[in-house]
Amino acid sequence: MVNPWVGPFEALTERVDADWAGVWALACTACQTLEVVQQTVLGAEDDWVLNLAGYFLVSAFLEVVDVHPEAAHSAETMNPRGLDFGDRDGALAAICLLLNGARRKLTQLAGHTELDLDDQLCALGMHRYLESAAVTIARMLNSRSASLN
């Protein structure tokens, strides 16, 4: 599986600060990427695994918006070149990279002692949903590659 986005997305995740804005940007990019896959890949909009991953992503956003309502208005994606993927599996692999990057930043963020309890709970809840989305997509990729062998 060739994925031209692995390098750029990995570099993006490393440059992001471990704060709410950074985590939010990574998650928004993953969410927009998933939407592009669902709109451009034949049959993807009816794929229950992708829909489940989308549900987990939306749930992660709701965790943040509940505590930080202003976040919904400041959502930014991190791909100025536009989203254009050669194949579905490459896009899904890129989404997993973004989600794993967001989870790493959340772990760092949750370790900050200056966060209040609401932010700590928000970080833990968002981490759980992002992990579920990443695992869901990774299982799909693994089962697809196993069926090709």
Indicate where each model-derived feature is located.
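Long, contiguous alpha-helical bundle segments
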Residues: M1-P4, Q32, D66-T77, S132
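Leu/Val/Ala/Ile-rich N-terminal alpha-helices, chiefly Sec-type signal peptides and the beginnings
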Residues: M1-W48
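Surface-exposed peri-terminal alpha-helical interaction modules
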Residues: V2, L26, E45, N79-F85, ...
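Residue-level recognition of alpha-helical structural elements
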Residues: D19, D46-L50, A91, L115-M126
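Alpha-helical segments in soluble extracytoplasmic regions
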Residues: Q39-T77
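Amphipathic protein-protein interaction modules
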Residues: D66-D116
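Preference for long, well-ordered alpha-helical segments
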Residues: L98-N149
